[in-house]
From Swiss-Prot:
Residue span of region Disordered: 121-208, 298-349
Role description: Binds single-stranded telomeric sequences of the type (TG[1-3])n in vitro. Has a role in meiosis.
UniProt cross-references to InterPro entries, sorted A to Z: Nucleotide-bd_a/b_plait_sf, RBD_domain_sf, RRM_dom, RRM_MRD1_RNA_proc_ribogen
Protein name: Single-stranded TG1-3 DNA-binding protein
UniProt-listed Pfam families: RRM_1
Amino acid sequence: MMSAEETVTQNAPNTVQDQVEASVDAAVHASAEQSNTPAQQADDFRVFVGRLSTSTKKSEIRSLFETVGTVRKVTIPFRRVRRGTRLVPSGIAFVTFNNQEDVDKAIETLNGKTLDDREIVVQKARPVQEQPIKDRKKSKNKNGEEPETSTSVENAESAKGSSDENEANTATAPSSNEANGVDKKQNEIKGKGGSGKNKAKPLPPNSIYVSGLSVTLTNEGLKEMFDAYNPTRARIAVRSLPPYIIRRIKLRGEQRRGRGFGFVSFANAEDQSRAIEEMNGKQVGDLTLVVKSAVFREDKQNDENEKNENEPIEASESAPTNVSDSTEPKASEVDSEEKSGVTASAITA
């Protein structure tokens, strides 16, 4: 028969083990309950703020909403500017309160109020559970901080965090796939032109180079000037302009200002020769025409003869033998509407 001391000694380990297991179970159960409650409360006590100015700061929003209750946090989603990596405020925000009473009061009191000269909208935020699940990626701004962003109201409303500085949705920076897509597109554009630069295309046979033209002369005017020699086409070399300016000019039905020279093509060599002989040196208004034959230059520079003997030389790389550099034509600057066959590969006397 065991003594009382032996019985206590034998049962002690089981008693301690039972107590430890019970305390662990209780702690796990309590933590599970606590993990669900704050998230649900954060979702229930949020309001959506719209029509904000992009210059409005968190502190200004917090100051306004603290007039109706205690503000737990303020979230301003950001969005990525199209075709860039710069982030700008999306013009909305989310304010989280501690209770439903403050939420109702904020909606009733602050909806329609003016903040930074903007009449804001205050509404109940949609719970996260009702929002569609979307992929989210993180990126960092120049300071190494994770910026807030939102490509839609749904994404913005799903933002969570523990403080005002680290609480918002993160921006989606251009991924490597997107970057590759841009590079691929650029390569395709380059592929069409052979290289990144605009290659000069050879002029049709029997073409001439004409300088001393008015900068306001149009293609039609140039062709009419040589009408007696049966020209097949005429093109003015135009000034380089940004693409958006070119689009505006075309929308207005206007022609870009010329550079004072152009090219005219003829049906046969006889008409070309007559045009050069009769029009070279002719006075047109205050200007004197210089008319020369536009042909391929077969010789370039010493070591490049064999390499480029069959390739057309861009007009920007060569000029008439007795024409100044100021009138040197660039193939990329001739009217883009009729590029093929218009730009001179080279011009010689």
